[in-house]
Curated annotation (Swiss-Prot):
Name of the protein: Aminopentol aminotransferase
Pfam families to which the protein is assigned, alphabetical: Aminotran_3
Family from the record: Belongs to the class-III pyridoxal-phosphate-dependent aminotransferase family.
GO terms for MF: pyridoxal phosphate binding; transaminase activity
Temperature-related properties: Optimum temperature is 35 degrees Celsius.
Keyword DNA repair tagged: no
Reaction catalyzed: (2S,3S,5R,10R,12S,14S,15R,16R)-2-amino-12,16-dimethylicosane-3,5,10,14,15-pentol + pyruvate = (3S,5R,10R,12S,14S,15R,16R)-3,5,10,14,15-pentahydroxy-12,16-dimethylicosan-2-one + L-alanine
CC cofactor: pyridoxal 5'-phosphate
Amino acid sequence: MANGTRQKDLRERAERVIPGGMYGHESTRLLPPEFPQFFRRALGARIWDADEQPYIDYMCAYGPNLLGYRQSEIEAAADAQRLLGDTMTGPSEIMVNLAEAFVGMVRHADWAMFCKNGSDATSTAMVLARAHTGRKTILCAKGAYHGASPWNTPHTAGILASDRVHVAYYTYNDAQSLSDAFKAHDGDIAAVFATPFRHEVFEDQALAQLEFARTARKCCDETGALLVVDDVRAGFRVARDCSWTHLGIEPDLSCWGKCFANGYPISALLGSNKARDAARDIFVTGSFWFSAVPMAAAIETLRIIRETPYLETLIASGAALRAGLEAQSQRHGLELKQTGPAQMPQIFFADDPDFRIGYAWAAACLKGGVYVHPYHNMFLSAAHTVDDVTETLEATDRAFSAVLRDFASLQPHPILMQLAGA
């Protein structure tokens, strides 16, 4: 059970030595109380919590698991490099190999820099854009998440107004709003940040409209600002290239993280020659940015991305899950809103403004051995098989029945209600 003996003990111990018992996106504070906080192991598309309760995992570690947990070829590549060395006095030659492989796969890229987390990559892109242009203003979509750094975090504790004084906002997918933002900050825009599609928590996802993407490219070309696609979350889950490739739009910079080393800690900033001099001139670094083991894992992950039908597998599994859920929702009379790419689904219920239905459904799915999320977009991996989807749909069908059975007594999450009233 999610609240088994080991889980309870770990939560109690964590409360004493970790602020809040857990922090950041890994905290289960906003999830249903049944959700486990601690996990013991993972393999393929499955995770086991601290009490060895198994789940088919549709969060994939919030994205990093692309090809399956502990994928054998990637683990072998990482193990081989680990025997040679990981964090050393200087980088391994494998860093050059990885840069060559990455640049060879991403059409707009002429060079690569590596770091650890998505926030590292986006903050480096911000600094680079200001160095390249000599300007201050960064344009971001309202509500967009580009990491946890002070200039962009959605939270306010410890953040000063001055941290964001040179960040301005536009409405995602609204070409006119973007054009107006350029006019309002004429002559001082260093970069426009855009996610490949709208993928914020507690919101329906929205695919990028061509007019919006073209306007972003046009405004940057006309003003000398840099176009930055933040592909940290979506990278390699919608394309084998930058996620705006299908729109025919190439950015100047793209930010990558999460899955290109299949869970090993590494992120990247890729750029065109236009921004090479600025990339050379800025100073960004980290003690573990040059670790060789994640780079070895990344090289093998990129090889699998190039050479296998992993993406087609992702899309097919996502489509099968989406179709099955839609059929179940109609049969049970509980309308779903499924948005975004099927392999990165966001699932909400219609007429559920305080998310009480979605939370109850997610908790019922968990009881049935399926880990879904009530407010964050989810992720499929190439390890999700047809049998996994079939087993998932059996559990989700039971979850629909449980929600209907308990419908009159469903209550919203108390912390969500506190936040809504704040």
